[in-house]
Amino acid sequence: MTNEDVGTNSVADRLQLGPREGVTYPIQMKYCGHCTMPIEYCEYYPEYEKCKEWLELHMPDDFERLKIEEEAAAADGTDDDKKRQKRGGKGLLRVKKKEDVPKRICVSRAARGKKKSVTVVTGLSTFDIDLKVAAKFFGTKFACGSSVTGDDEIVIQGDVKDDLFDVIPEKWAEIDEDVIEDLGDQKRT
């Protein structure tokens, strides 16, 4: 058998190197603003209806072309709902919504032993501040031990409560001095 018998002409056409006829280079891709994928792949996204709304507002000419293609596919009966995932698998990752908790920072002093005390800072996580970074900052700023002890609690060794009213707004500009609340002396639990 020779190569001509197998049909190498069609294989050679498919494996042609270089630019193809009828294609303009460089290729410009259009991306959806909702799902951030190329608009050809929006139909495979679980929230396809929202992608269509975005396309209608921002790319009306592409939306019209998409609508014509959908109508043609519906007329052929090739749609068959096979594109959307109905059950199983991971599906779409849901973004957790931020709870609307009041943004305030509470600073208190608690006794530790006979003559020693600790300063407890709570509420920094409502401002999306990394507590580990904040604890490290307080430890270096006040030359003392500082650690994250709870979900939203930093314990600083020593009585530095008065200094925190100046240090926190200075370090994090998004925190105003008015949202820092002094709870006074507390009993540690």
UniProtKB/Swiss-Prot annotation:
Domain of life: Eukaryota
Matching SUPFAM superfamilies: eIF1-like
GO molecular function per UniProt: mRNA 5'-UTR binding; translation initiation factor activity
Domain SUI1: from-to ranges: 105-172
Record note on disruption phenotype: Animals die as pharate adults with crooked legs, abnormal genitalia and a larval-like epidermis. Proliferation of histoblast cells is impaired.
Function: Regulates translation as part of a complex with MCTS1. Specifically required for translational re-initiation in mRNAs containing upstream open reading frames (uORFs). Not required for standard translational initiation. Regulates expression of a subset of gene products including mbc, InR and EcR.
Protein name, entry field: Density-regulated protein homolog
